[in-house]
Amino acid sequence: MTPSPEVVAILPSRDEADTIAAVTRAVDAALDDDRALIVHADSSSTPATAVAFRATATRARTVCLTGLPTGKGAQILRALDHHGQECVVLLADTDTRNPDPATYRALLNIVVQGAVMALADYPRYWDEANLTNHLARGLIALATGHDVPQPLAGDLALSAAAIRSVPERYHALPGQLARCVEGYGIDAFLLQAAARAEEPIVPVRLARTKQHAPSFPHLPVIFAQAVPVLLHPAVSGLAMAPEVGAFRLTDRELPARRLTRMLAQLRALRPAESRYDQTAWPHALAAAWRAVAGGVAAVTAAQWLWPAYLDHVSTWLADTSGMATRALTLRAAATELLLTLTTTPRDSS
């Protein structure tokens, strides 16, 4: 009889044939255990990614789940249903171009030592991570009371207790929100679930900037799926304001032609008609949170926020400030958001 694994690593993917083998080898080196299990959860458009995974030699046992529904969350949830209910779970992005066994090992060790969740905290290029830096970090802090520098990190570890809470929380979600969690909303959802435990959530500070496939081309889908999940906790009527730490940005040159192209893409994404009064950031974000607290569906509030977000990211990309100023600007905006929305429960006297 095959022994139950103490650790399951889940590798969600869609068309990552060029990087899946390196990520698999790095995860296997971190596990270093023939009782561990690596689950490839794949919804690729061709067999190439699964073929590359199966061809990668590992010490750990492997399972390849193919033909899964499209969506990162759907892949992860299906893998958890099959293999991840009673053990520590490692999640690893499969588009990573510089996978490091030490990172995965550090995440696992912290959870094994008693944390409910450990997340990679890597520096980000200043022109990337726009959803994290301008929106997700502040909203996660509001909802959970935890300042998590990279709340949407795809590289993380979760305790067995955290994993056991996932199915019930997922099935309790409204239909539209559940579909968001089946996509890019999964990262925020897992963090929100873990935050309900008493055990700590631990960011693992890393020195190297993460190298991965650019997310900018997928910005509309990522926003539409992640932001409703980030806003949904406002229905509780309670917001918390932990101290927000420094933002770590990595400098790099953004060629003028590329910047021009990105700004044009952002302009093209802006709805012709929208419910938008050009409220300054982060007050537009605060208004979206208040709307959800007042009964507006999180999906609707996210749609209202979209034009303001596009304008804010455009301004950020066009700005010529240095990294130190940019980092201070991000921290000030997140702090202002939290202080603006700090409240007491609705039923308090």
Task: State where each predicted segment sits.
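Short beta-strand/loop segment that forms part of the nucleotide-sugar
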Residues: 11, 34-45
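Short, well-formed alpha-helical segments that are part of the catalytic scaffolds
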Residues: 15-29
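Conserved donor nucleotide-binding strand/loop of the catalytic core
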Residues: 36, 50-74
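A conserved acidic beta->alpha catalytic loop
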Residues: 42-51, 96
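Active-site nucleotide-sugar/metal-binding loop of Leloir-type enzymes
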Residues: 74-88
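Short beta-strand-to-loop acidic/aromatic patch adjacent to the donor-nucleotide binding site
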Residues: 86-97
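Conserved donor-nucleotide/metal-binding helix-loop-beta segment in metal-dependent transferases, i.e.
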Residues: 99-121
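Terminal low-complexity segments of carbohydrate-biosynthetic enzymes
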Residues: 224-349
